[in-house]
Regions:
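C-terminal and inter-domain tail/linker signature
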Residues: 1-111
Length: 111
């Protein structure tokens, strides 16, 4: 987790998909750490693979294939999500997650 946090601006704004956290954003390293720790509590074998990147000027769209299994239920999920990332001074300052990849492309004017 420390390697990820090193790539994020200390004041990062991270907006998980709307159904997570009641649609609210999280801010800063401490909240990101808490959010990711809560995912680890609920999900095992969690991993993401980059499928494709799109240059959108000040932003980058990342298509990800995500894999996880519920710790209590054993249910496996494989959502194909997108992140829209904004960078400043080499650090990610904003991350917005989309469950619909077309929505991510529309958000940056690529569709």
């Amino acid at each position: 987790m420390d390697a990820l946090l090193a790539e994020l601006d200390p004041d990062i704004e991270w907006r998980p998909h709307l159904s997570a956290l009641g649609g609210r954003s999280i801010r800063g390293h401490a909240e990101v750490r808490d959010y990711l720790a809560s995912l680890e509590e609920e999900w095992e074998d969690f991993r993401q693979e980059v499928e494709r990147l799109f240059d959108a000027g000040d932003e980058v769209v990342v298509f990800l294939n995500t894999y996880s299994r519920g710790r209590a239920s054993g249910i496996e999920l494989q959502p194909r999500v997108a992140h829209v990332l904004r960078f400043r001074d080499g650090k990610c300052v904003k991350c917005v997650t989309y469950l619909d990849r077309a929505d991510a492309l529309r958000a940056v004017g690529l569709r």
